[in-house]
């Protein structure tokens, strides 16, 4: 029996965070899990690049849920990207 290699992709956007978990099946990519959550990161950035506490908590709770969904996916097979909102943070 061959091992199924799963991969995870995390998109940390200014408005919402997305997670996709996929695997190869019979030469095709098959999405096995997908989740999107509105976080409002960009709207939560205050003066001087500080993040509003409520938005920070919402983002952390979302990332905890993503972590649970990524169980079983090797860390080296997970990629995460952040948008401009992360560059604006101090």
Regions from the language model: what does each represent?
Residues 3-90:
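Conserved phosphate-binding loops in N-terminal lobes of ATP-dependent enzymes
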């Amino acid at each position: 029996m061959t091992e199924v290699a799963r991969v995870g992709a995390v998109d940390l956007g200014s408005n919402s965070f997305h997670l996709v978990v996929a695997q190869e099946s019979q030469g095709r990519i098959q999405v096995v899990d997908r989740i999107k959550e509105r976080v409002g990161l960009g709207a939560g950035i205050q003066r001087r690049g500080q993040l509003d506490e409520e938005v920070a908590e919402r983002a952390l709770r979302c990332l905890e849920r993503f972590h649970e969904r990524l169980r079983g996916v090797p860390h080296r097979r997970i990629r995460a990207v952040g948008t401009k909102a992360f560059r604006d943070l101090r």
